[in-house]
Amino acid sequence: MHKDGDFLVDYEEKVFEDFKAEPGEKALATFHTVAFEGSISIVNTLSATRLLRKGYETSILLYGPGVTMGFQRGFPTLGDEAFPGHLFVNQRLAKFMEEGGKVYACRFSTQALYGQTEKAFIPGIIPINPLDVLDCILLHKKANAVIMDSWTV
């Protein structure tokens, strides 16, 4: 019988080399997903932070429904956690930026799709022109960056 504190799998064995970035290497994580829709926003913000800690110049791109990840939230007031985990995505994005990562969010999605203003964003998020979404991706492709695309439908 297993009990609290037992390991069910081997966490000690690592199969692959622990890669670190070479100077100047870049990474981009894109999000076209609604905040809290499944676990993708949680998992890939953690992955983006891990890339940053491995030395990659890492950016996050929020576009389409992904901009909802960057909105300030809370209840009953902004910043108040209504229940444990309620602000996890916000906290992860803030931590990512604290550690030097950049977060970009599409202005078109913000206004046209969600009726929000740039003031709705977590401080530090950089609003961008909708034409910059593709150029951000192309810039990273040209730099041979690691790119993680996150989509939900």
Language-model segments: which ranges?
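Positively charged, low-complexity intrinsically disordered leader regions
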Residues: 2-23
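Short, glycine-rich nucleotide/cofactor-binding loops
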Residues: 23, 27-42
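Histidine-anchored nucleotide/phosphate-binding helix
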Residues: 40-60
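Short internal beta-strands
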Residues: 57-64, 103-107
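N-terminal beta-loop-helix "entrance" segment that forms/cooperates
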Residues: 66-79
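A glycine-rich helix N-cap at a beta->alpha junction
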Residues: 78-112
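A short aromatic-anchored loop/beta-hairpin motif
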Residues: 96-99, 104, 113-114, 120-141
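Glycine-rich, aromatic-bearing surface loops/beta-hairpins
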Residues: 137, 142-153
